[in-house]
Structure formats: C-alpha cells, structure tokens
Amino acid sequence: ITVPEQETAQNPMNLIASIWLCGVAVLLVYAAVSYVHIRRKVRESVRIEGNIYICDRIQTPFIFGVLNPRIYLPSSLKEVQIKNVVAHEKAHIRRLDYLWKPLGYVLFAVYWFNPFCWLAYILFCRDIEMACDERVIKDWSAEQKKEYSLVLLSFHVPGKMITVCPLAFGEVGVKQLSLIHI
C-alpha cells in the first residue's frame, strides 16, 4: 500500500520534524560561526606562558578550545588582575568545563523546543562559573576573596544571559558568586 504524496506532505509530523531540524541547524550554525569569529580574533595572540595567551582583539579573558584548551587574556589586563583571572580560568580547565559546556550546548541544541532546556542551559552556564569560583576561593582569606570578586566583576557584561560562544568560557561571565563573598 502506498501513501499518496499529498498526504505525506501534509503530515503534521513532517512539519514538526522540519521545524525541529531547522532549530537544531540554526543553533549549530550559530556555534560554528561563533567559533570561527573567536578563532579569527585570537589568531594573532601571543603565547606568554604554557597555555596562556595575550590578545589585543579581546576585551575579556576566556578559555577557548576543546581538545587543547587555551587561556586568552586581553592585553588591557593589569598585572594585579592576572593572578586572579588565571586562577579562575585554570579552575575551568581542572574541572573539565571545556568539555562539559559544549556537551551541554549540544543537548540544548537538540532539545531547543523545550523552554525548560533554555532555562537549564542558562543555569548550567551560571553553575559552571559559580562552581569554578568556589573552587578557586575555598581556602582564601576574606581580603583575597574580595580582591578576586572585584577583578571578576570588572569583566562582567550586563544584559547578556547566554555566553557568546558555546565553546568558550568567560567572554560574558556570570559572576554572581563573587558578590556573595565581598
């Protein structure tokens, strides 16, 4: 038995599947374009030590890369800020956040149609940052925590909820935990 072509084209499941697939494609293309954009920005960065690079074309520090994560620092970073920023970014690497965040984004892309997935991804990114902050400051004095908080807050970009690139950390920065420890 064959199904007439007209019935197949009007099948609601085909329409729903097409819309879902378009949503997945849009989110994955967004990730790819973001990746290429950041890659171009850091192309001329200069290695200063190990996996730490300095770059004139970025405004905030971040980690970039899945197989070989690198820490990128803006050239405008002051010497007193570097210790805290590098400690934060190295905590991301130790926690393997550079693997977890892209995995979370893939799940978000697949389940984009569920509003709870949007919320879950936003909270996931926030929790990654908060867990990283907790790890860095757990044995620090109150004064060190305050200094750390102020440094990280200086990179906060208001009005951004989802990070600019699903494969990078810190380019927007949700630093709510920092406020708690001041």
Where are these regions (language model features)?
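Membrane-embedded and juxtamembrane structural elements of multi-pass membrane proteins
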Residues: 4-181
